[in-house]
Amino acid sequence: MIPVTSFAGKTVAVFGLGGSGLASCHALKAGGAEVIAADDNAENVAKAAQAGFITADLRDVSWAGFAALVLAPGVPLTHPVPHWSVLKAREAGVEVIGDIELFCRERRRHAPDAPFVAITGTNGKSTTTALIAHLTKVAGYDTQMGGNIGTAILSLEPPRTGRVHVIEMSSYQIDLTPSLDPSVGILLNVSEDHIDRHGTIAHYAAVKERLVAGVQAGGTSIVGVDDGYCRDIADRLDRAGKNVVRISVKNPLASGIHVEHGTIVRTAGGARSEVAKLGGIGSLRGLHNAQNAACAAAAALAMGISQDVLQDGLRSFPGLAHRMEQVGRRGNVLFVNDSKGTNADATAHALSSFADIFWIAGGKPKAGGITSLTGFFPRIRKAYLIGEAAQEFSGTLGTQVAHEISQTLDVAVEHAARDAEASGLTDAVVLLSPACASFDQYRNFEIRGTKFRELVQALPGVKPVV
């Protein structure tokens, strides 16, 4: 745990008592603050009370004595409308911050030179975060990984020399971190997402920009420049005098890091050097993972990690569950769990990575459906449609792609495995990449992906991928 000493002797309200909120309560209390815990969920309030915290309905207390409101990232700060606790705080002139802001203040107080790598982007954040954490561990760092990837930042060990914090940040978390100042900041990409919480794509992109704009003096801002928003951001950072490393997997760069034919290449001052090779690394398959790997490589190089260690780390990276996860093989058939593919953009990355696909798709549909994926239809040998989206997706596939409405995941896995094996194709792939949320049949994408893995591994003759 990281004791938060910056509010010692003061009273702090914490709203939102899930994982990060409860960790904030413990960290503030350990640092000497008085904590008033609150949540709209009575169950969460009861848990906080059982943990020994003072709880209250913040609508019924005076805000005059609060030094800050620590807000959970899932609570609306601005859009669609600010949460009532935010309005109360603003009326009382109380600053509204998040748990990562508390971390930043503690780092500046106690270990300002401790490495702090922050990662954001619309897609690829978790894989890049996990990959950088893996690389730093291979390089011998005491590595602490957390943030949006799942572990509350304040439950990690405190910053210190030789210890690196590798932190995934959502746009919500950036919004709540006004003094964000990583030593290495990474912006992978920006595409339309979470507009319900940010109002416009311009505001969403501006929030993302703050992570790389806030990099501390002497640090490195790493920006993927394969979309227009990020190209503009990189140019603005240049003009502001930041040390910018541009990343591309689509075009060679005169200065920066790009990927060509499976090789990560660095160019600077007219010189070109090969940094690492991605060929044969199953956990980093696909153009999207090439971008993740290139950004991670740039971070590793910025931290002084050698190319030999970098290459070893890339090759030994196991990948993340539910993200292009190779869960088994039977004869000519590879089974891939990409349950994290909850929208068409994410699924496009998976479909672009294989040639002969038996595709399991569907769930709770999102706006636009799969119409943007028509360019990948020639790669799909047959589709197996599940959940609420089945009829809609069937209409989009029409006569272009052979398909069936399997309705449930167990039926889809059974039929896709049978058809893929019977196809005689050398590299057939049964791919779960639903292009949908899971909520019609599963509580979250993790449970859906775990069910897929279990179904595959229960098939006779399926072996682990080595």
UniProtKB/Swiss-Prot annotation:
GO CC, any one term: cytoplasm
Pathway involvement of the protein, from the record: Cell wall biogenesis; peptidoglycan biosynthesis
Pfam families per UniProt: KARI_N (PF07991), Mur_ligase_C (PF02875), Mur_ligase_M (PF08245)
Cell compartment(s), UniProt: Cytoplasm
EC number: 6.3.2.9
Encoding gene per record: murD
Protein family (similarity comment): Belongs to the MurCDEF family.
HAMAP family noted in UniProt: MurD (MF_00639)
Lineage top rank: taxon: Bacteria
Chain positions recorded as ATP binding sites: G121, T122, N123, G124, K125, S126, T127
Name assigned to this protein: UDP-N-acetylmuramoylalanine--D-glutamate ligase
Catalysed conversion reaction: UDP-N-acetyl-alpha-D-muramoyl-L-alanine + D-glutamate + ATP = UDP-N-acetyl-alpha-D-muramoyl-L-alanyl-D-glutamate + ADP + phosphate + H(+)
UniProt GO MF annotations: ATP binding; UDP-N-acetylmuramoylalanine-D-glutamate ligase activity
Keywords: ATP-binding, Cell cycle, Cell division, Cell shape, Cell wall biogenesis/degradation, Cytoplasm, Ligase, Nucleotide-binding, Peptidoglycan synthesis
GO biological process: cell division; cell wall organization; peptidoglycan biosynthetic process; regulation of cell shape
Function: Cell wall formation. Catalyzes the addition of glutamate to the nucleotide precursor UDP-N-acetylmuramoyl-L-alanine (UMA).
